[in-house]
């Protein structure tokens, strides 16, 4: 993430949730079901933002599970922490650039929700996360609450056209060409979901 992007996310953090009309409960529940997230799982939520996934993750993994939420934006993390005050399990929060810094721990699932186009080195980052942070049999879930064309239109409106999101099929082909085992779990108007690993 560039300094310009970080500044943008810090500025828009207070109004982010009111702008996000796509992250509906039924879509997030479907994401977690298709992604295989279950009770007692350990979750690494990369680019947690304002923590939109956290209540759903906590309900899904329960008290025997664990959640680590990572974001570089202090503004976003402040809101995520406020959202998580009563959650069980209580998430552990890390403010760091996960592309530049190694992360501790091993996880059943690593989730990148609305994150992939912001990665500067996606293949390198996914390889490292899979090698260093993903439990055997686990998945890295790349997800969006709508189709790629709509995400690209949003990025065009806010003048970040270089943040292009390929279709799930295109992304899967690209990742496989770089020796990352990827498969499409959902590709429709309500959910974009690609799994890496497993």
Model segments located where?
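A short acidic, Gly/Pro-enriched loop at the edge of an enzyme's catalytic core
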Residues: 99-110
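A short glycine-rich, Lys/Arg-flanked "PGG" loop and its adjoining helix->strand segment in the class I
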Residues: 124-136
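Conserved beta-strand signature within the Rossmann-like core of class I S-adenosyl-L-methionine
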Residues: 137-145
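A short SAM/SAH-binding and catalytic strip from SAM-dependent methyltransferases
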Residues: 109-122
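Conserved class I S-adenosyl-L-methionine
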Residues: 1-36, 56, 79, 148-150, ...
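Acceptor-substrate binding/catalytic loop of class I
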Residues: 154-169
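Core SAM-dependent methyltransferase catalytic element
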Residues: 180, 186-198
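Class I SAM-dependent methyltransferase SAM/SAH-binding core
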Residues: 44, 50-100
């Amino acid at each position: 993430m560039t300094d310009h992007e970080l500044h943008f996310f810090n500025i828009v953090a207070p109004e982010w949730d009111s702008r996000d009309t796509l992250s509906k409960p039924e879509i997030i529940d479907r994401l977690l079901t298709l992604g295989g997230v279950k009770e007692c799982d350990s979750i690494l939520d990369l680019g947690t933002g304002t923590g939109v996934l956290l209540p759903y993750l906590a309900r899904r993994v329960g008290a025997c599970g664990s959640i680590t939420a990572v974001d570089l934006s202090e503004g976003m993390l402040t809101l995520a922490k406020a959202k998580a005050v009563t959650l069980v399990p209580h998430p552990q929060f890390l403010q760091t650039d996960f592309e530049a810094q190694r992360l501790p721990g091993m996880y059943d699932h690593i989730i990148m929700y609305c994150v992939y186009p912001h990665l500067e080195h996606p293949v390198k980052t996914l390889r490292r996360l899979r090698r260093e942070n993903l439990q055997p049999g686990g998945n890295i879930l790349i997800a969006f609450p709508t189709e790629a064309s709509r995400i690209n239109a949003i990025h065009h409106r806010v003048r970040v056209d270089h943040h292009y999101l390929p279709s799930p099929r295109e992304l899967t082909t690209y990742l496989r060409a770089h020796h990352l085992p990827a498969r499409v779990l959902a590709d429709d108007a309500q959910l974009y979901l690609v799994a890496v690993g497993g």
